[in-house]
From Swiss-Prot:
This protein's encoding gene: ndhC
Molecular-function GO terms, alphabetical: NADH dehydrogenase (ubiquinone) activity; quinone binding
TM annotation in the entry: 9-29, 64-84, 88-108
Descriptive protein name: NAD(P)H-quinone oxidoreductase subunit 3, chloroplastic
E.C. code: 7.1.1.-
InterPro entries xref list: NAD(P)H_OxRDtase_bac/plastid (IPR023043), NADH_UbQ/plastoQ_OxRdtase_su3 (IPR000440), NDAH_ubi_oxred_su3_sf (IPR038430)
Superkingdom of this protein's organism: Eukaryota
Organism the protein comes from: Lupinus luteus
Keyword annotations of the record: Chloroplast, Membrane, NAD, NADP, Plastid, Plastoquinone, Quinone, Thylakoid, Translocase, Transmembrane, Transmembrane helix, Transport
GO biological process: photosynthesis, light reaction
Cell location: Plastid, Chloroplast thylakoid membrane
High-level lineage: Eukaryota, Viridiplantae, Streptophyta, Embryophyta, Tracheophyta
Record note on quaternary structure: NDH is composed of at least 16 different subunits, 5 of which are encoded in the nucleus.
Length: 120
């Protein structure tokens, strides 16, 4: 028998955790002073008069490093629970995790061969 009342705490937490930021934005939008002028449209430079354009063009290698970092950061998120329950799960899950790591190693070798990890 599926009992929905067991999830009451979850739904209460979800509603409260959604309402707090929404209310914070609404209250600050209502109570905050609105002033329009040229100072509001300029970029803030720690009290120094801004010089030049605020838009900078980043080189693509920053994005490649960030992408490789995110891939291996997500790998850590997936492998940590597996490592904590390794003795309970058995050999089949070990083989699946090994395949997962091998696929990531292939991706790392591909990025390395394409020059995504070179900083020159």
């Amino acid at each position: 028998m599926f009992l929905l009342y067991e999830y009451d705490i979850f739904w209460a937490f979800l509603i409260i955790s959604s309402l707090i930021p929404i209310l914070a934005f609404l209250i600050s939008g209502i109570l905050a002073p609105i002033s329009k002028g040229p100072e509001k449209l300029s970029s803030y430079e720690s009290g120094i008069e801004p010089m030049g354009d605020a838009w900078l063009q980043f080189r693509i290698r920053y994005y490649m490093f960030a992408l490789v970092f995110v891939v291996f950061d997500v790998e850590t998120v997936f492998l940590y629970p597996w490592a904590m329950s390794f003795d309970v799960l058995g050999v089949s899950v070990f083989i699946e995790a090994l395949i997962f790591v091998l696929i990531l190693i292939v991706g790392l070798v591909y990025a390395w061969r394409k020059g995504a990890l070179e900083w020159s």
